[in-house]
Amino acid sequence: GLDTVSFSTKGATYITYVNFLNELRVKTKPEGNSHGIPSLRKSSDDPGSSFVVAG
């Protein structure tokens, strides 16, 4: 399966955002010869502003 990193803007704080960025940085780090790109899904109250990126 793909690695996933999630972040919700609802109830978000500076700390939760920093933790999200750190997790994203760790999971996108290249391992050996392969580069892993996690699934990234943005959750929001408006379904029109959600997105999924998978590599």
Swiss-Prot record:
One of its GO terms (molecular function) is toxin activity. GO terms for biological process: defense response to virus; negative regulation of translation. Keywords: Antiviral defense, Hydrolase, Plant defense, Protein synthesis inhibitor, Toxin. It is an enzyme of class 3 (hydrolase). Its EC number is 3.2.2.22. It comes from the Eukaryota. The keyword NADP does not apply. InterPro entries: Ribosome-inact_prot_sf, Ribosome_inactivat_prot_sub1. The keyword Coiled coil does not apply. Residues 29-55 are annotated as: Disordered. It catalyses: Endohydrolysis of the N-glycosidic bond at one specific adenosine on the 28S rRNA. Belongs to the ribosome-inactivating protein family. Type 1 RIP subfamily. Single-chain ribosome-inactivating protein, possessing high antiviral potency and low toxicity to normal cells in culture and to intact animals. Capable of inhibiting HIV-1 infection and replication. This is Antiviral protein GAP-31.
